[in-house]
Every structure is written in structure tokens, then in C-alpha cells.
């Protein structure tokens, strides 16, 4: 498996199913309507976040678009190929830190599937070599915004972050139906967020802020 640099400078997996489209059009994050609306909201409200945590960073496209509105961003990406792209894409930014691991509702090690032709990486609940941690175990107490894009593993991330979420102001989460792999529906996740006191600010499928 290999990675390549697009004409606009972004490093991406050369095996990705959408690579031809990105070669022609550039940054893939521009396809994200919810993100674009949130960026407009941040600009309009002159919003600046002290600390943002990006869970499931992929190659860093979301982080690159948000870094202008954040003093610090911590990125978590367990897939080694995607992490290699991430490290190259954000390496010049002093306010961005990267971690090659997964987040969930357990502390230990898990196995990942290898879906190199997509942006998807599945976490298998069995022993492996990829580190996984609860967000609550990492000592955060001042996160302003969390973005979660973990291909169905959202509820596990949320359950492992119950204490941390008490002080979080905003969550952007992708709900594309893959959560049923792990026993949770989109409705379950929405109800869980509602029970924690969160209200919808922006909703453009498949993402919610």
C-alpha cells in the first residue's frame, strides 16, 4: 500500500476509491456540506476554540479546515496508512498534535480491518496490536469541540467519554448507518446525545453538530 501527494499538496492513500476524483478536484473535505456550514457559522460568530479533539482523523482534511478556528487540535487516527498521510499533512502546524491510536470504551489493544480502498477502518473487539483508550482515561478537562468520524464506532467513543463530555460545548459526529455493526442505531446515538444535554445546531446528512 502506498500514499501520494495531490497537486494541491495533500497526501492521501493512492489506493483510495475516490483518488481519481481528488486528483482532478483537489481537497476532498470540500465535499463535506456540514463542515462547510459549520465553518461559515464559526466565521459569522467569530468562534475560536481553545482545544479541539478530532476522533477518526483520516488524513487530516477536517483538521486542516478547522485549524484556523482552533488554538490547539489533537488528532486520533488508528489506521497506519491514514496516519502516515496525516503526519505529513499537518506536520508543519505547531498547534496540531497527532496520535496513532483508536478511541472507544476500553483501554487496551484491538484489531483493525484493512479497507485500503476506502476511508473506512473497522475496529474489531478482539485483541490486536492497535492501542485503544477511553477519552476519559486521557486526562482531558477542557475540550471545546469533539469531532467523531469512526465508521459506526460512535457510541463506543461516546460511552468512553462520559466524564469528558460534561465540559464539552460542541460535538460534530458522522452518523452514516454503520453503527449497527456495533449494536447501536442512529436513533440510539441521537437519544444518547440528547440525554447528555446536546442540541442540534447544524444537520446535513450524514453529519450533525
Task: State each model region's role.
Residues 4-36, 94, 99-140:
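Glycine-rich adenosyl-binding loop in Rossmann-like folds that engage adenosine-containing cofactors
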Residues 66, 86, 112, 157-161:
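Hydrophobic packing residues within well-ordered alpha-helices of enzyme cores
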Residues 49-62, 127-128, 132-184:
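Active-site segment flanking the S-adenosylmethionine/decSAM binding pocket
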Residues 41, 45, 108-111, 158:
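Adenylate-forming
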Residues 79-80, 102-105, 152, 177-179:
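Short "lid" loop at the C-terminus of a central beta-strand within the Rossmann-like core
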Amino acid at each position: 500500500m502506498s500514499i501520494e501527494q495531490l497537486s494541491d499538496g495533500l497526501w492521501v492513500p493512492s489506493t483510495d476509491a475516490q483518488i481519481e476524483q481528488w486528483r482532478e478536484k483537489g481537497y476532498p473535505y470540500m465535499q463535506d456540506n456540514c463542515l462547510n456550514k459549520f465553518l461559515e457559522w464559526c466565521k459569522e460568530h467569530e468562534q475560536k476554540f481553545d482545544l479541539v479533539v478530532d476522533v477518526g482523523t483520516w488524513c487530516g482534511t477536517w483538521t486542516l479546515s478547522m485549524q484556523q478556528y482552533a488554538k490547539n487540535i489533537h488528532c486520533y487516527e488508528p489506521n497506519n496508512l491514514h496516519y502516515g498521510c496525516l503526519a505529513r499533512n499537518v506536520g508543519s502546524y505547531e498547534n496540531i498534535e497527532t496520535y496513532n491510536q483508536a478511541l472507544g470504551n476500553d483501554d487496551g489493544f484491538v484489531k483493525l480491518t484493512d479497507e485500503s480502498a476506502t476511508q473506512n477502518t473497522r475496529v474489531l473487539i478482539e485483541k490486536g496490536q492497535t492501542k485503544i483508550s477511553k477519552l476519559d482515561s486521557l486526562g482531558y478537562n477542557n475540550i471545546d469541540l469533539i469531532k467523531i468520524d469512526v465508521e459506526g464506532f460512535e457510541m463506543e467513543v461516546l460511552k468512553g467519554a462520559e466524564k469528558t463530555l460534561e465540559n464539552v460545548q460542541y460535538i460534530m459526529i458522522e452518523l452514516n448507518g454503520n453503527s449497527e455493526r456495533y449494536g447501536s442505531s442512529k436513533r440510539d446515538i441521537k437519544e444518547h446525545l440528547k440525554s447528555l444535554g446536546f442540541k442540534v445546531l447544524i444537520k446535513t446528512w450524514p453529519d450533525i453538530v
